[in-house]
């Protein structure tokens, strides 16, 4: 993909900032990184510039996306004793890259993409703070793979994500029912 073929960024409802940059950030970041990071939901100029300034283009100092997310303190620090989980809070830190990813996660939560659906599902499970951390963790892993592997981001719609999630839930319930000696059967929804 050449710079001229870069698709338009997703429509955002933002206002112009007082300190606008004098160059086209999308084109320059594409030239520097080789991937259009602005296609990730929630990513804007500030997020991309902050991540690149904090991590650099070379992500080889982190062996995997899990190490990268851990460095950002976006992984739960599960503490166990006697086989029982006593705490699973993330480590507190002042990492500016993690803060940028958290802001991007909040923004991504308002979109109609798979990350937006993921955010809403996690918000129902863990509350707003847990959803922000979980979505920021997912964004960190996506960022790592896109930059390191030079892959383009292929977004999925929220409807497709929800359908896959429903299919996973159905498979899980079918397996649990079979383990208990029951069989699940679909009921006609004609009421």
Regions found by a protein language model. Give the residues of each.
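A detector of single, family-specific signature residues
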Residues: 1-191
């Amino acid at each position: 993909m050449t710079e001229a073929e870069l698709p338009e960024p997703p429509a955002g409802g933002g206002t112009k900032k007082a300190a606008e940059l004098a160059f086209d950030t999308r084109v320059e970041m594409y030239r520097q990184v080789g991937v259009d990071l602005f296609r990730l939901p929630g990513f804007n100029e500030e997020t991309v510039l902050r991540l690149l300034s904090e991590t650099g283009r070379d992500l080889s100092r982190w062996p995997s996306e899990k190490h990268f997310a851990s460095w950002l303190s976006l992984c739960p620090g599960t503490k166990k004793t006697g086989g029982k989980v006593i705490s699973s809070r993330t480590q507190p830190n002042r990492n500016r890259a993690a803060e940028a990813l958290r802001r991007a996660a909040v923004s991504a939560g308002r979109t109609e993409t798979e990350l937006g659906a993921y955010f809403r599902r996690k918000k129902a499970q863990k509350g707003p703070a847990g959803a922000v951390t979980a979505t920021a963790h997912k964004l960190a892993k996506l960022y790592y793979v896109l930059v390191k592997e030079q892959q383009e981001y292929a977004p999925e719609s929220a409807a497709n994500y929800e359908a896959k999630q429903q299919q996973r839930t159905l498979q899980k319930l079918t397996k649990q029912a079979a383990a208990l000696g029951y069989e699940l059967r679909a009921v006609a929804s004609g009421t």
